Curated annotation (Swiss-Prot):
Modulates RecA activity. This is Regulatory protein RecX. The gene is recX. One of its GO terms (cellular component) is cytoplasm. It comes from Bacillus anthracis. NCBIfam families: PRK14135.1. Disulfide bonds: none annotated. Its main location: cytoplasm.
Amino acid sequence: MAVITKIEVQKRSKERFNIYIDKGQGEEYGFSVNEVILIKHGLQKGLEIDEIALGNILYNEEVQKAYLQAISYLSYQMRTKLEIEDFLRKKEVGQAIISEVVSKLLHDRYINDKEYAILYTRTQSNVNRKGPTVIKRELLNKGVQDLIIMHSLQEYTKEKQIENALILIEKKKKSYQKHSFLQMKLKLDEMLVRKGYSRDVIQICLEELKDEKDDEKQQEALHYHGNKYYEKYKKYDGWTFENKMKQALYRKGFSIDEIEIFLQMKREEG
C-alpha cells in the first residue's frame, strides 16, 4: 500500500502531473499521469493506492498516451481505422491498448471509414483524376471494406470518368507528337490503365481521339523516325535495307502503305 504525498505540475507540460508516494520508507517519485487520468481516478494528496489500483492507473495512462498520439496523427489529415492501428503498432503500443484507443476514436467520431472513403474518392477523382480501379485498390490497402468502397464510388459516374480520362489524354498526347498515331494510342491506353480506368471508358475516349487524327503530324512523325532509321540502316543494300526499315517503322505503329510511300520518297531522293 502506498499513500500519495505530493502532486506537482510538470514544468514542460501543464497537462501532466508528477505523483509522489510514500510506501513506508519516506517520500519518493511514483509516476506521472495526464490530467485526464488524474481526474478520472480522483488522485489527490493523502489517497491510499494498492498494487491493483496502481496497475489500473498506469494502464489507463498508457491508453490516454496512445489516444493523444493518435489524435496528433489525425490532426494532419483524415485516417482510416487500419491506418491508426498500423501507426500505433509502429509506436510499439500493445494490441489491447490499440483496441481501446480505436474504440474511443470511433465513438468520438475522429475516425469514420465511410466518410473517409467518400472524401478520398472525391479528392482522387477531382484533383488527381484517378480511375475507380486505382481508387478502390488504394482504399482496400487502407483497410476500407468492399461495401464501403462500392458506396463511395457510386458518385464517381461514368460521365465523370470519361471527362477525367479525356483531360489526361489531352495533357499527355503532347508528349507523343513524334510517335505514330497508333503508337500514341497504345501509350495513352497504357497510361489510362495505370490510372485505373475501365476498358469500356478507355475505348470510348480513344474513339474520340480517332476523330482528331492529324495527318500532318502523322507525316512529321513518320519522317522523324524514318530519317532516323534511314541513317541507321543505309549501310545495307537492297532487300536487307528495305526489310529493316519496314520492320522498324512498323514496330513504331506506321502502316505498310505509309512506310511504302516514305521508302518511295527516299528512292526518288537517292
